[in-house]
């Protein structure tokens, strides 16, 4: 009875996280990611002389670059919060596989039933998904700060391109918030 309750209780946050990833990440990238955008490289490339980039790319690629710039700036301005977000991502990467290994070994030595092992794996995955979603807010705030700077710099001649790039940057953050085991399932 308890494993079934845990299965149901774990399925809800997993389904909610997958739905949020699709709605705020995958759907937005599908709608806006293919848009060809043109930027002014003198305003787009940061002062530290990053690798040379193309002036014409898709909104998907510019969004990815904007997110990476935002994360780098965030690392400099608030390293404690950035490390916390990175730790939550590592938690989501490590906990489901480790719980799977422990559950399989527990089944092999006949300490828990198979249904209990499946429930434990799903519970660990649900916990990882919840931690990933809850720790996403500071990253989105960092992307918002970078987007504000992007708007002030007027890196994109067309406002529509700029908005598509910002939406794609936010979508990349949502896309990468799930634990990798769920990201493999939810392509």
Residue ranges with predicted function:
Residues 89-111, 119-129:
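Alpha-helical transmembrane segments and their immediate juxtamembrane boundary regions
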Residues 114-144:
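Alpha-helical transmembrane segments and their immediate juxtamembrane interface regions
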Residues 2-95, 133-187:
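Polar-ligand-bearing catalytic/cofactor-coordination segments
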Residues 1-11, 109-124:
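Hydrophobic alpha-helical transmembrane segments
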């Amino acid at each position: 009875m308890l494993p079934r309750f845990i299965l149901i209780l774990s399925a809800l946050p997993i389904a909610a996280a997958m739905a949020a990833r699709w709605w705020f990440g995958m759907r937005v990238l599908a709608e806006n990611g293919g848009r060809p955008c043109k930027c002014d490289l003198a305003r787009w490339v940061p002062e530290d002389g990053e690798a040379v980039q193309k002036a014409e790319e898709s909104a998907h690629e510019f969004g990815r670059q904007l997110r990476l710039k935002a994360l780098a700036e965030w690392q400099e301005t608030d390293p404690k919060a950035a490390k916390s977000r990175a730790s939550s991502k590592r938690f989501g990467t490590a906990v489901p596989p480790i719980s799977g290994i422990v559950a399989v070994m527990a089944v092999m030595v006949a300490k828990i039933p198979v249904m209990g092992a499946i429930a434990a794996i799903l519970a660990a995955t649900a916990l990882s998904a919840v931690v990933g979603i809850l720790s996403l807010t500071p990253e989105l705030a960092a992307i918002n700060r970078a987007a504000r700077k992007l708007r002030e710099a007027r890196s994109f001649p067309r406002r529509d391109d700029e908005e598509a790039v910002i939406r794609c940057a936010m979508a990349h953050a949502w896309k990468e918030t799930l634990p990798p085991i769920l990201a493999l399932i939810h392509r």
